[in-house]
């Protein structure tokens, strides 16, 4: 963890999704769990980071405004210390792109 990180715990998951009890339906959480498990990655749910971003004019008011926040463990795509891309950068980018497509499909199928 970086010094500025709120959570200094080791053993972070590969990916983390931040959720909101009002704006993140269980459906999105289950899709996320299944996707990352199938890909062989670990997934934290609100661990080590929690919450998601919702426009204030909809926050806790508009139930059909959904929100999920994706955090990616730097160890997957960076050589540390520093900010050089690792050999896994492209693979990580492709995984994220595929995940976003899965989420988009989930919205379209409703």
Identify the residue ranges that each predicted region occupies.
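Catalytic cores of processing enzymes, dominated by hydrolases/peptidases
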Residues: 1-78
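His/Asp/Glu-rich mid-to-C-terminal helical/loop segments that flank catalytic regions of hydrolases
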Residues: 80-110
């Amino acid at each position: 963890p970086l010094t500025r990180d709120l959570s200094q715990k080791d053993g972070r998951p590969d990916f983390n999704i931040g959720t909101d009890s009002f704006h993140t339906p269980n459906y999105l959480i289950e899709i996320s769990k299944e996707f990352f498990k199938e890909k062989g990655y670990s997934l934290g749910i609100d661990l080590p980071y929690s919450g998601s971003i919702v426009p204030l004019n909809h926050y806790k008011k508009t139930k059909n405004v959904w929100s999920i926040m994706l955090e990616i463990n730097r160890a997957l795509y960076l050589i540390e210390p520093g900010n050089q891309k690792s050999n896994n950068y492209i693979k990580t980018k492709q995984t994220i792109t595929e995940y976003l497509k899965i989420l988009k499909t989930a919205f379209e199928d409703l």
